[in-house]
C-alpha cells in the first residue's frame, strides 16, 4: 500500500428551496462572475435554472451561460467553456444539473486557469492551483 494524505474540503447545503441561496454561497466562496453550465432539458422545464439566475442577480453577481451538455460530454463544449471563462473574466463555474454537467464543469474550471490542454489532467498531470467551482 502506498502512503498518502487526502484533503478535500467540501461544503454541502441540502434542503427545499436552497437553490434560492445560490448567490449567497457563490459570494461566500469568492465568486463575482459566474459561468452557469447546464444541459437544458429538465433544469429549464422545472424552473431551477431561472431560480438560480434570480439568486445570482439578487446578490449582484454577473453570469454567463453555457448550456447544451449531453450525456458523456464532448471535449468541444469543454473547450468552449474554457474560452468563455477566459474571455468573460469568469471566476466561478457553477454546474446546474447532473453527472455529465458536473464532469464537464470541473474540466472547464481546471482548464480555465491552465495554459496547456485540459486533457493533460486526464493523462495524470497535476493541477497546481484551483478555480472556484460549485454544483447545484
Predicted region positions:
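Glycine/threonine-rich beta-strand-loop-alpha-helix active-site module
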Residues: 76-136
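ATP/NTP phosphate-donor binding region
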Residues: 1-92
Amino acid at each position: 500500500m502506498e502512503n498518502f494524505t487526502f484533503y478535500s474540503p467540501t461544503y454541502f447545503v441540502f434542503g427545499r428551496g436552497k437553490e434560492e441561496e445560490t448567490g449567497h454561497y457563490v459570494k461566500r466562496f469568492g465568486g463575482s462572475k459566474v459561468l452557469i453550465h447546464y444541459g437544458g432539458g429538465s433544469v429549464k422545464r422545472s424552473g431551477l435554472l431561472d431560480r438560480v439566475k434570480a439568486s445570482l442577480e439578487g446578490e449582484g453577481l454577473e453570469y454567463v451561460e453555457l448550456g447544451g451538455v449531453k450525456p458523456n460530454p464532448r471535449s468541444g463544449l469543454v473547450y468552449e467553456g474554457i474560452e468563455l471563462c477566459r474571455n468573460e473574466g469568469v471566476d466561478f463555474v457553477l454546474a446546474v444539473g447532473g453527472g455529465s454537467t458536473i464532469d464537464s464543469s470541473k474540466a472547464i474550471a481546471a482548464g480555465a486557469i491552465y495554459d496547456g490542454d485540459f486533457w493533460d489532467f486526464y493523462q495524470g498531470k497535476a493541477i497546481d492551483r484551483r478555480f472556484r467551482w460549485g454544483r447545484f
